[in-house]
Amino acid sequence: TKNKKHTCKIWRNIRDMLDVEYPEAALIAEWNGPRMSLKNGFDMDFYLEWQGNGYSWLMRNYDGAMDSNPHNIGKAYFCKNSGTGIDKFLNEYLPAYKATHKDGLWCFITCNHDTIRPSAGLTTDELRLAYATIFTLPGAPFVYYGDEIGMRYLPLPTKEGGYFRTGSRTPMQWDNTANHGFSTAEADKLYLPVDTAAGAPTVADQQADPDSLLNTVKSLLAFRHTHAD
């Protein structure tokens, strides 16, 4: 988030070229620096989860390091009994939003490949509340695959430099067939294992349950699309 004026100049040039060839295209930054990205050619920027920042305060607020699995989870604002306030988030979010909302969208994400899944510290009901909040705040919400069904974070050994992030990169869980429907290969041939523990959420199970997290997410997104403001 430092001043990177030359990087910004490059992206403004790319934006100019893109507008000529693909005027309908949108550019999305993974910067978490809306004051730079949205004023230099990007339409959107992710509000990334950085340990200790405002977004982390809302959804995770854990302890840990790159080479260790997260611990002391359960301190986030959306954890029912955490006692954590919302001020740290508001103090970070509001000034940046007010400074950039006319330039583009600073977007909430449920997770990404570099972040522990929100289900690591939030119950299903807490996830419903968290999603209801970030899906109705300004910006365009991004749902990381599997978060719509509450896929669990798996504390796996690091794989090719994944470190603690490895546990958020496991295969999508579609149904209750082999490998949860992700692949017909033998389980030991998968790049990362599927969640084999009892109660592993699947799309098939949640589609059939009107009270599932998946159907809550669908309802929230439908609500968002029918309420422009």
Predicted regions and their residues:
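Amphipathic alpha-helical segments in well-structured domains
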Residues: T7-W11, L127
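Aromatic- and acidic-residue-enriched carbohydrate-binding clefts of CAZyme catalytic domains
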Residues: T1-K5
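Short, conserved catalytic or adaptor-binding loops enriched in Gly and charged residues
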Residues: A96-H101
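Loop/helix patches that line or flank the sugar-binding groove of alpha-linked glycan CAZymes
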Residues: R15, D19-E21, A26, G33, ...
